[in-house]
Amino acid sequence: MTLTDLVAHTARQLAQAGVSFGHGTANAHDEAAWLVLHALGLPLDTDLADESWSKQPLTADQQAQVAILLRARIDSRQPLAYLTREAWLQGVPFYVDQRAIVPRSLIAECLAEGSIDPWLSAQTHRLLDLCTGNGSLAVLAALAWPEVSVQACDLSADALAVARINV
């Protein structure tokens, strides 16, 4: 079985199992690609169309690694991000676990495209991220505006523990 075959097989299994998407991926194929690449220790930006990867035969051990993660995803119904302990937002990886929700936010898109910039002025020196969860928006804001002091807070001590890992 090749990498391409395994991604297709994994996507079919996810679709047949009826798992939910939306915690980093929008469909079975994208989630399968993430699952397979993570399980095999390959970069998530691996070009699956590149024949040097896509046609490469996989060992039985590699297929078993993918099968273990796939089974955990289907049986637990947990977002893949919780199983891999990693979520990506605007191209930035964040640690995540069940103590905070998987980051996904329209605000992150606004930060990336600069549509919040007009609301800032030369007098903007501080930003507060309320209900920070895993801290991803605070990190993205600090990256977008390095001259602004960003503070993050949350009522949940568990969520703050996750945020500390990411900042």
Where are these regions (language model features)?
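SAM-dependent Rossmann-like transferase core, predominantly class I methyltransferases
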Residues: S54, A64-I165
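Generic helix-packing signal
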Residues: L14, V36, P43, A142-P146, ...
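N-terminal auxiliary segments of SAM/dcSAM-dependent transferases
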Residues: M1-L89
